[in-house]
Amino acid sequence: EMCIRDRFHLNQPWIRFIKTIYLNFKLLPWNIAVKLPIYLYGPVNLYWLKGKIEIKSNKIYRGMIKLGRNYEYFNGSDGSSFIYMSPKSTIIFNGPCAIGNNYKIRVETNAILEFGEYTFFGSSIKFICTDKIKIGHYTRCAYESQIIDTNSHFVYNEKNNKVARKKGSIEIGDFNWIGNRTTITKGTKTKEGTIVCANSTLNKDFTKLEENHQMLGGIPAKLITSGLKRIFSTKIDKQIEQYFSSNKDEEFYTIKTPFIDNYNDIIYWFKKIM
């Protein structure tokens, strides 16, 4: 279905029915494929498709996973989207997932790319998985970011005559908010509720740090501060927006009651807008 705001957006790509049907029946078990849980939108190239897709969700329904829609409304499809799956490669969806237009997904032999439930990725996102990439539930990653678990080439250290592994796993925690044009490389791990500043490069295990609700940023990224939480509740967000609209000189809004976020609003967003 096309939501109301889509009617006013000329660059919203159409669902590609033939490729949608082909991908579902090519990569999913027949009893799952008939439900057409994956929708492909806009121009997309399908390469090889020798792996498999698993959907680990109690409820599997039509279009719960949407790839290639235009969610951000500042660019159109450029025809560069592709899905490449080598033999014995696996993509796992643990629930609903949305990926914007102009995406690239490449999963190599024996590699596993896993998406948590209700995850969202902006346009021009790039996934290159040669080992294992796991992205936590409710995580959001903005446009033009890339998650790559390999250096692609070995590097010789002439100081100690050693050569490190060129690939390694990536594990992104639940409820992460990753800014645009972020690069996430092998060995990266983040805690639940992490915020990543735009244009950052993550390349290490941040779960070893004691601080929770971390804000990371920089090249390479480091801990900037902690104790910051993105607000997901639509109701609270509107209250704050109204406050600042009515109080032009105020810099901060004070939450006077214990802060309890409503993560169900993420589910609502998926159902009403996705």
Regions found by a protein language model. Give the residues of each.
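Short helix-loop boundary/capping segments
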Residues: 147, 152-158
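Domain-scale signature associated with acetyltransferase and cell-envelope carbohydrate enzymes
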Residues: 5-148, 169-175, 182, 192, ...
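A generic "structured core" feature
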Residues: 185, 195-197, 201
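Short beta-to-alpha loop/turn elements within the nucleotide-binding domains of ABC transporters
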Residues: 188
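Flexible glycine-rich beta->alpha loop in the catalytic core of nucleotide-sugar glycosyltransferases
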Residues: 153, 200-201, 207-208
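A short acidic, glycine-rich active-site loop
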Residues: 162-170
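Conserved beta-strand->loop/alpha-helix structural units within folded catalytic cores of enzymes
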Residues: 179-180, 198
